[in-house]
Amino acid sequence: MQFLVDTHTHTISSGHAYSTVLENAAAASQRGLEMFCVTDHAPTMPGAPHFWHFANQRVIPRLLHGVAVLRGVEANILNIEGEIDLDERIINQLDWVMASFHEPVFRYTNKSDHTQALLNVIRSGRVDAIGHPGNPNYDFDFESVFKEAAKHNVVMEINNSSLSGSRVGSEIRCEDIAMYIKEIGGRITTGSDAHFAADVGNFESVEPLLKKVNFPIESIITRHSRSFLDFLEERGKKAISELAHL
C-alpha cells in the first residue's frame, strides 16, 4: 500500500511548524511523493497567519523539486453551526480545504455538540475533508457523520501524527473510523500533518493501520496524484491546467 499524495502539511507560517514550502517540497521529492498540499492553520489558531497568506498562495509555483504543490488550508471549526475561519472569497481560490477541531479554538464539550458541528460543516459545501477526526477529545456519532460525509463527498482523514502520539488515544478510534468508512463504502484521505520537513509524506503509522483493516486502496484518494485530482474535480473544483499531465 502506497500513498503518493500528502494532503496535510504545515510551514513556518503556522507559527509552531519549522520548515518552508521549499523545504517541504524537497522532502516530498526525497520521499518519492507526486504531490503535497500546503495546509497552514487558518487565522483563528494562535500563531496562525493573516488571511492574506492564504489568498496569496497563487504565487507558489505548481511544481517544486518535481513535486506538484496544491494550495490549501487547515481551517478551524468555530462552533456548532459549522462555521470556519476563512471567508468564501478566499476559500474559492484554494484547491483543498480541510476543517478540524482544535482545542484553542473550539473547546471540546460533548458528543452531541461535536456531531452537530461536523454535520453542519459537511453540509456547508465549503470543505473537502475533516482533519484528524480520530482525536478522542472530540467524540461524535460515527454513523450520522460518516453517512453525511459520503452523501456530500467529503472525506475523513487518517492522520499519521495522531497515530504517532500527538493526540493520545487516537489509535483505536482511527482504526474504528477506517473500519466504519470501509463498511459504508466511503473514502478517506491520508495526511502526515507534518510540522517539520522530514515528516512530509510520513505514513509509517497510517499504512499498517489501513492494511490491518483491509481498507480498499481504490477508496483512498491519496493513492496517487490523478486519483486526488479526480476527487477535487468531482467536488466541482476547476481542473488545474499546469497539472494536466499527471
From Swiss-Prot:
The record lists the organism as Photobacterium profundum (strain SS9)
Of which family is this protein a member? Belongs to the PHP family.
Sample GO molecular function, one term: zinc ion binding
Please tell me where Zn(2+) 1 binds in this chain: 8, 10, 74, 193
Keyword field contains Metal-binding: yes
Q: What is this protein called?
A: Probable phosphatase PBPRB2022
Annotated signal peptide? none
Q: Which GO terms describe its biological process?
A: bacterial-type flagellum-dependent swarming motility
The UniProt keyword set, sorted, is: Hydrolase, Metal-binding, Zinc
* A Pfam family reported for this protein in Swiss-Prot or TrEMBL: PHP
Give its E.C. classification number: 3.1.3.-
Q: Which PANTHER family match?
A: PHOSPHATASE YCDX-RELATED
Q: In which residues is Zn(2+) 3 bound?
A: 74, 102, 132
Q: GO CC terms for this protein?
A: cytosol
Q: How is the cofactor bound?
A: Binds 3 Zn(2+) ions per subunit.
Residues at which Zn(2+) 2 binds? 16, 41, 195
**Group of enzyme by EC:** hydrolase
The cofactor named in the record is:
Zn(2+)
